[in-house]
Amino acid sequence: MKLEFVGPASLLETGDVFYPAVLDGKDLKCSFSYEALQDLDPEGVETNVLQLFKTHQLKLLSIVEQKILNGHAVDGAVHLFSHDLVLD
């Protein structure tokens, strides 16, 4: 399995963040829920969702990679929600 995160991150109309990837030569849509991103900043210090994503990008992409390896990529997409986060 070959996975490449190609980016860049963009904001969807729903407030979620989209980050494109390529899995075994096919486009893969990675989305990160607005709620999950908010959970990373419980104090509400960062109000820019894209900046919040960029601040936690490595952790978020690592979690999505694990979801993909566990077979959770369906129909060319994988979604990260609050319950997927393992907060320190």
Positions of PLM-derived features:
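A short, structured beta-strand/loop element
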Residues: 18-41
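Short linear sequence elements within intrinsically disordered, low-complexity coil regions
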Residues: 8-10, 23-24, 37-39, 58, ...
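Generic detection of intrinsically disordered/low-complexity segments and helix-coil linkers/edges
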Residues: 12-13, 26-28, 47, 75
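Short, charged/polar N-terminal "headpieces" of proteins
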Residues: 1-26
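N-terminal start-of-chain detector that recognizes signal peptides
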Residues: 1-5, 33, 50-53
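Solvent-exposed, flexible loop/coil residues
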Residues: 5-9, 32, 41-44, 82-84
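Acidic, low-complexity intrinsically disordered segments
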Residues: 45-88
